[in-house]
């Protein structure tokens, strides 16, 4: 994306980043729900999509190809000295987080998944304190407390609400918790790479997705999921089109996020992605008839308020002295 300085005027760069992130991940979210929660076929023989490993495999292949193109045209001067084993280790948590997140959609609705994934500051802070010995400002803890309160309100259902799936905290929520924890580990690994090897975003995107492709490729062959998916795709060929678009919007969205961080910093990027997630929940409610109670809306607002305040006031960290 280095070439974008000459290709895009300064005054248009922020609107381009905002629209790029918003449109790509907005459509990504719609496709994700359509693929994973849609019904295929007619009548009593309707089927659901259960091929989480294959979905993430295709996504990683497209991400790796896209990163390779970016390096080839815009990032040829950078020499990557990051240790190979670090990429391999990071890819394990990266794959686990994405597979868990997609698998969770078989058990929880999309607003719950988006809200759950929005709680990333919680494991990041916990892992930062325990593994990296970081100290955070009071504002950070208050923001995380606000997020926790919002999630608690969203998950609490005192009585049955018409049209809302009634369930206790179960396997879907555990998958989201696992995804969040693995996201935190991925973030710690990526911070280590940047701090010790000055790893570029495009090289990181390429190598982590390449290793993830190898892991997932072995997984879908070993479990036989690949052949089941191909049979499913033969019965419902439109799924291929949706999955390819899903992977493409993911890769484009990542590139716009990196561009936003480079030119405007993590604060602006955090505000844009937080806004996008809120409107993705709204779209899911409207387009896919995922009703949300008034208490859940209050919880949703609290979560995004906590995320917004965290982006503004909770970024200061310092390492403890040893």
Curated annotation (Swiss-Prot):
State whether keyword Membrane applies: yes
Q: What is this protein called?
A: Solute carrier family 35 member B1
Where would I look for the motif Di-lysine motif in this sequence? Answer: 318-322
What protein family does this chain belong to?
Answer: Belongs to the nucleotide-sugar transporter family. SLC35B subfamily.
The organism's lineage? Eukaryota, Metazoa, Chordata, Craniata, Vertebrata
Topology in membrane: Multi-pass membrane protein
| Chemical reaction(s) catalysed | ADP(in) + ATP(out) = ADP(out) + ATP(in); UDP(out) + ATP(in) = UDP(in) + ATP(out); UTP(out) + ATP(in) = UTP(in) + ATP(out); dATP(out) + ATP(in) = dATP(in) + ATP(out)
Its domain description in UniProt is:
The di-lysine motif confers endoplasmic reticulum localization for type I membrane proteins.
